[in-house]
Curated annotation (Swiss-Prot):
Stretch list, region Disordered: 1-22
Organism: Homo sapiens
Record GO terms (molecular function): neuropeptide receptor activity; vasopressin receptor activity
Topological domains annotated Cytoplasmic: 74-82, 145-164, 234-275, 334-371
Protein name: Neuropeptide S receptor
Length: 371
């Protein structure tokens, strides 16, 4: 969905917005242009057409190629951990984002108008919003899974179905919360002659409650849950790292403390937590400007200037960047935490007591938590 949702007409001076409060039919024309200081800048879909097409094509290629590499990498793994399962789910979501959201936007920017039938308009908008929710809720599921892995490790090992249940819930909520999109959006003719797949509001005032609800469901509530989960995880790791020093000091070299094996955290799990946190930070960096701009814009807190219109064009493409960045993060972390067995055997004789202890812990886990 575009960052700038304004559809009302501006007066000639560009100082205010004149809205018709009476209900309109789905086919009524509306203005879809920005007027800044008396100059018309055109619609979002025609402005900076070449620049937007180049940007979207680059994002599309990086998204599809990058996530294809991730999916191939996880498919080749003989031992698939729960972390690998979530990485796969995230890559699938990002791949569909590239095919449905980015590729559709490329076609839309190229034609300028929406040339498909009204039904296609509604379905495309619905799928775009589904992926919007899913990309966030998969991260929420990942944070809950990491919380159980660190805080309740023994229950975590016994609950193999939890990961799949979390993903099913994430996708189910995504499809459910996106249903209003089928009613809200439709194909309509704008007053400047363009035909767009746009909201069928009677006037712009409906955008404010709609975008507020979407922002909370897609961003603020999930981000709160994620922050709480990882806050507890980081605190647990810090406490157990202190316990580690006490346990090691009471163990003579060559012995393994069973209490350590049961209670402390492997390097692989900590690496997985670091990967997860970086993924979350990338999500925040790409999506925060989008929702912040939309909220300020819909509450009329931004000036009607040329700069605001330029910002809306740039910010609109930031969410797509998230799907292109995630595979790069995976590649960085996977190369640093995946060790061939041959190298482990050659280094076995040079292992310290701490390294032998951690290796023993990994052997007693039914599914080691590496990416």
């Amino acid at each position: 969905m575009p960052a700038n949702f304004t559809e009302g007409s501006f007066d000639s001076s560009g100082t205010g917005q004149t809205l018709d409060s009476s209900p309109v039919a789905c086919t009524e024309t509306v203005t879809f242009t920005e007027v800044v200081e008396g100059k018309e800048w055109g619609s979002f879909y025609y402005s900076f057409k070449t620049e937007q097409l180049i940007t979207l094509w680059v994002l599309f290629v990086f998204t599809i190629v990058g996530n294809s590499v991730v999916l191939f990498s996880t498919w080749r793994r003989k031992k698939k951990s729960r972390m690998t399962f979530f990485v796969t789910q995230l890559a699938i979501t990002d791949s569909f984002t590239g095919l449905v959201n980015i590729l559709t936007d490329i076609n839309w920017r190229f034609t300028g108008d929406f040339t498909a039938p009204d039904l296609v308009c509604r379905v495309v908008r619905y799928l775009q919003v589904v992926l919007l929710y899913a990309s966030t809720y998969v991260l929420v599921s990942l944070s809950i899974d990491r919380y159980h892995a660190i805080v309740y490790p023994m229950k975590f090992l016994q609950g193999e179905k939890q990961a799949r249940v979390l993903i099913v819930i994430a996708w189910s909520l995504s499809f459910l919360f996106s249903i209003p999109t089928l009613i809200i959006f439709g194909k309509r003719t704008l007053s400047n002659g363009e035909v767009q797949c746009w909201a069928l509001w009677p006037d712009d005032s409906y955008w404010t409650p709609y975008m507020t609800i979407v922002a909370f469901l897609v961003y603020f509530i999930p981000l709160t849950i994620i922050s709480i989960m990882y806050g507890i995880v980081i605190r647990t790791i810090w406490i157990k790292s202190k316990t580690y020093e006490t346990v090691i000091s009471n163990c003579s070299d060559g012995k393994l403390c069973s209490s350590y094996n049961r209670g402390l955290i492997s390097k692989a799990k900590i690496k997985a937590i670091k990967y997860s946190i970086i993924i979350i930070l990338a999500f925040i960096c790409c999506w925060s400007p989008y929702f912040l701009f939309d909220i300020l814009d819909n509450f009329n807190l931004l000036p009607d200037t040329q700069e605001r219109f330029y910002a809306s064009v740039i910010i609109q493409n930031l969410p797509a960047l998230n799907s292109a960045i995630n595979p790069l993060i995976y590649c960085v972390f996977s190369s640093s935490i995946s060790f061939p067995c041959r190298e482990q055997r050659s280094q076995d004789s040079r292992m310290t007591f701490r390294e032998r202890t951690e290796r023993h812990e990994m052997q007693i886990l039914s599914k080691p938590e590496f990416i």
